[in-house]
Amino acid sequence: MSSVKGQSIWIGVDVGTTGVRAIAYEASGVSRAAAEAFYPLRTPHPDRAEERPSEIRAATEQVVHKVADALRHQGRIPSGIALSTVMHSLIPLDAAKEPLADMQTWADSRSAGIVRELKENEPALCRAFYERTGCPMHACYPLAKILWLKQNRSELFARTKFIGSIKDHLFHAFTAA
């Protein structure tokens, strides 16, 4: 689909740590509509930084609808949507790919103790991880979060059928893929 006079318009969506923004641009770089919404970052303990995937999904739907509605009022139809999200989030998912718990964000450091133990007791593993990924072993990465989940929330880990990020969750929610 394209918009008026063949002018391509794309909606860019940026899902951040505490809010989401959507903006529609013509190929020429002219902005045609924008919206933003916010959601809370929960820090129930100094080493925890969590969010509810349902709140992020609702906020994302809200801003995309606002921008799409504004474009419709201008007689324009978006050509597509580009999605960018925060990195290193972790959501335990059930068999239907629905969240089983709040999302651990990139800022969640509850797995720091596991990382410390790995660095002390398994330096070769940490070196291999770095050589393969280009990333040092760190509490922000999903691997450390998964290990923490397995060791500290074994009942939740046992019910978890998939592990996803916020981007995975949104793609699944919007496309059922």
PLM ranges: what are they?
Residues 1-101, 127, 131, 159:
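N-terminal glycine/serine-rich phosphate-binding loop of ATP-dependent small-molecule kinases
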Residues 65-177:
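Glycine-rich phosphate-binding/catalytic subdomain of phosphoryl-transfer
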